[in-house]
Amino acid sequence: MDKLIIKGGSKISGSVNVHGSKNSALPIIVSSLLSEKTLKLSNVPNVVDVLNLIKLLKNYGVKIEHKKNKLKISPSKIKNLSADYDVVRKMRASILILGPLLSRFGEARISLPGGCAIGTRPIDIHLAGLSKLGANFDIQNGFVVGSVKSQLIGNKIKLPFPSVGATENILMASVLAKGETKISNAAREPEIEDLSKCLIKMGAKIEGHGTKTILVQGVTKLKKAEHEIISDRIVAG
């Protein structure tokens, strides 16, 4: 086809259903690890990455009820702090588990996504940001092993570039950190705003989400919440 001819002038009407955003659902599902209370989500997209993440959380001992586009996540009885390599290698978003686990339990162990070495993917920006909050990391046999001496402590963190994943990881970790955390050069995507809104419903104190500077005042615990995932802007076009 050499050309495409479009004849306008006709009135456009109707509607289309757009499923929930995968890039919003993944960090929000992970955020459930911060609390012992139930998190109910709706408009959850039925895509492979979400299904893999559900499998990963179940490996941790999280109870999850999945019906159509709804999730009921009950993370009160987490029994395992080491992520399964077979699941992690399938999805980069698994690195987001570090922040919540370190914040709530003070330790986490996760294989490098895809078995990659540091530097081949932007994992280092996650580790650098979490280190500013007081986390310590070692790389052992292809695993990232993180620990916290007592509790994560709020700090001023300036990202070298507005990484969406790093912003999400640091944001989640800082929710239970002691004191205030300031994230500068933060990502401003709608998915960051959606995650922040869900965390606020859970009891987090967050300001500035959707801007390049996010302020988080740490809290001691979170509460049960319900949240609807935003529609996928990529699918909507």
Stretch-by-stretch model annotation:
Residues 1-237:
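Structural preference for solvent-exposed beta-strand-turn elements
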